[in-house]
């Protein structure tokens, strides 16, 4: 049981670190979109969409795992809160990345 709790704690910690990196990537991608609007580069558009796709895939994977974990009967209040918090953070990031992808796809390239 202690092993499982430690595993959950480490998993949440690692996911929070990845979400923080995704937030930084989102800011960087927003700057790249500004550059894309000026340059109309097909290569830059493809690169931005690839990076967004990787972020969305990570969030979707984490979401599936955390939703399964929340069904466990042995979770204490703190563990449940941590999983729900990670799901909420992931949902916000997913929404922002999806909106950015929509914006990028709408940009005409040369």
Curated annotation (Swiss-Prot):
Keywords: Allergen
One Pfam family linked to the record: Blo-t-5
Name recorded for this polypeptide: Mite allergen Lep d 5
S-S pairs: none
Species name: Lepidoglyphus destructor (Storage mite)
Source species taxonomy: Eukaryota, Metazoa, Ecdysozoa, Arthropoda, Chelicerata
Record-linked InterPro entries: Mite_allergen_group-5/21, Mite_allergen_group-5/21_sf
Similarity comment text for this entry: Belongs to the mite group 5 allergen family.
Gene3D superfamilies: 1.20.58.970
Membrane-spanning segments: none
């Amino acid at each position: 049981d202690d092993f499982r709790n430690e595993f959950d704690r480490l998993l949440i910690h690692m996911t929070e670190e990845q979400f923080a990196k995704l937030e930084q990537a989102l800011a960087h991608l927003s700057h790249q979109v500004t550059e894309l609007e000026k340059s109309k580069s097909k290569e830059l558009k493809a690169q931005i969409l690839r990076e967004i796709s990787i972020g969305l895939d990570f969030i979707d994977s984490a979401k599936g795992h955390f939703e399964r974990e929340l069904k466990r009967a042995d979770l204490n209040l703190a563990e449940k809160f941590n999983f729900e918090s990670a799901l909420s953070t992931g949902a916000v990031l997913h929404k922002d990345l999806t909106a950015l992808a929509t914006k990028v796809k709408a940009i005409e390239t040369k």
